[in-house]
Amino acid sequence: MEFKLEAHRIVSISLGKIYNSRVQRGGIKLHKNLLVSLVLRSARQVYLSDPCPGLYLAGPAGTPAPPPQQQPGEPAAGPPAGWGEPPPPAARASWPETEPQPERSSVSDAPRVGDEVPVATVTGVGDVFQGGEADATEAAWSRVEGPRQAAAREAEGTAGGWGVFPEVSRAARRPCGCPLGGEDPPGTPAATPRAACCCAPQPAEDEPPAPPAVCPRKRCAAGVGGGPAGCPAPGSTPLKKPRRNLEQPPSGGEDDDAEEMETGNVANLISIFGSSFSGLLRKSPGGGREEEEGEESGPEAAEPGQICCDKPVLRDMNPWSTAIVAF
């Protein structure tokens, strides 16, 4: 009875601490981590205090099954066949070999009978190959040099005809056909006003505005700088992009609401861990409230292993219970 009262007192104190810890930064998360570690400590104490831990392993939910025992007649379980072996070599058909090895040896032995004939044959093949390369090179150069030579001939013919037909050559130099020096074409009356040439440069006010200079992406933030699209003006000093923290006010109320919502999850966490270890704790001789004490105990909890120091039960424990004890 005294043990249960002490467990109730520890639970109430711990729940009060958890409820009051929401005013601290990260307090509720810290207590959740402590709950997880203390639940495992309580499981260790239960396993050490239970005289026959192997009989109650089927009780908790989510307990991994121990590895199956091997029969003496069965071979040892090992990695699957082919594990760790290098891949098989590629087939010979994938390699670009046109002749098998015996034919190569016969070809290499053939020049011994008549040395001059194979050499001449190989030389002729090489000459034909080199001649084909030369023809291909000349054809490529003719394609490139042909338009250049034609353009040069046209330029020379035009330069030679300037002295004979100066007006025609000048008119040919402009795509619109307007004379260069401002002279009127022949046959035009003197009273006719001279029309402006479409090729002449337009005045400055008719020119469209120059496109804005491309600025780096870092400087193109909206509202920064005096140029278009956020770019700095030509004569202005580049400004730094304002931090987003200044634009968005700190939301302290949302954090408080989140922490208040998290306080409701403490009971769910306790119930989850309690259901997972309920099969062990109900059949343990220590009492029914050992689980709650282990979950909610703070600094007042006793050190693990003090309950069952005089019970040698480690010899018949399976790997799952051994792992919990090692924790």
From Swiss-Prot:
InterPro entries (alphabetical): IER
Location of region: Disordered: 59-166, 227-313
Annotated disulfide bonds: none
Comp. bias regions, Acidic residues: 253-262
Record's compositionally biased regions (Low complexity): 71-84
GO cellular component: cytoplasm; nucleolus; nucleoplasm; nucleus
Polar residues composition-biased segments: 265-278
Any Gene Ontology biological process: positive regulation of cellular response to heat
Keywords of this entry: Activator, Cytoplasm, Nucleus, Repressor, Stress response, Transcription, Transcription regulation
Induction comment: Up-regulated by heat shock in a heat shock HSF1-dependent manner. Up-regulated by ionizing radiation.
Subcellular compartments: Nucleus; Cytoplasm
Keyword Transferase: no
Tissue localization of expression: Expressed in acute myeloid leukemia (AML) cells.
GO molecular function, a single term: identical protein binding
Protein's job: Plays a role as a transcription factor. Mediates positive transcriptional regulation of several chaperone genes during the heat shock response in a HSF1-dependent manner. Mediates negative transcriptional regulation of CDC25B expression. Plays a role in the dephosphorylation of the heat shock factor HSF1 and ribosomal protein S6 kinase (S6K) by the protein phosphatase PP2A. Involved in the regulation of cell proliferation and resistance to thermal stress. Involved in the cell cycle checkpoint and survival in response to ionizing radiation. Associates with chromatin to the CDC25B promoter.
Record's subunit section: Monomer. Homodimer. Associates with the catalytic subunit of protein phosphatase PP2A. Interacts (via N- and C-terminal regions) with PPP2R2B. Interacts with PPP2R2A, PPP2R2C and PPP2R2D. Interacts (via N-terminus) with RPS6KB1. Interacts (via central region) with HSF1; this interaction promotes PPP2CA-induced HSF1 dephosphorylation, leading to enhanced HSF1 transcriptional activity.
Similarity remark: Belongs to the IER family.
Protein name as it appears in the record: Immediate early response gene 5 protein
Origin species: Homo sapiens (Human)
